[in-house]
Amino acid sequence: MYWGGTSYGYYENHGHVRTKGYNLSLLYSFSHWFDVGGTFNCIDTRDYEKYLAGTSLQESMHYKVRMPNLPYRYANINANFHWNDLFIKGNVLTIGYDSYWQHDFPLYWENIGDKDSKNMVPEQFSHNLSLSYTMKNGRYNVSFECQNFTDAQLFDNFSLQKAGRAFYGKFRVFFGR
């Protein structure tokens, strides 16, 4: 939606949307010290509202067109090394890597406008590292994480740029049994 040269976002509820897709997942664990896994997702979400809302005769320009602002191909992978009973029985050190890939997709309806000048959420590939030390069989946990360690340009679904490389720390105490 444009108003005086400025772009605004808006929400629209669609009554008939069909989603088809698949998810492939794989996880391999070796001897409690290494695991690797990943997923690949392909989702096709289309507008099946044949007529414009509130009318009975005007056909929708978006009938059977892929819904805007939704990624339809994305994947992630992860790998973790675990050192069980490190220093003390019941403690575990875990070093992990994970990444996320997402193809580029249109911010607005793909059937409207010139393909060369469309607003697109760009393809993204992020990489993260983590280090976690769990003590007393999971009662205490200290974690450090570096998200987007390659400092890639990443965007959310509204094509707003996310923060670059970021570092996080966490200390957790489990008060249950």
Question: What spans do the regions from the language model cover?
Answer:
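C-terminal regions of RecA-like/P-loop NTPase motor modules
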Residues: 1-3
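Gram-negative outer-membrane beta-barrel transporters
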Residues: 6-106
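Conserved C-terminal beta-signal and adjacent last beta-strands/turns
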Residues: 64-177
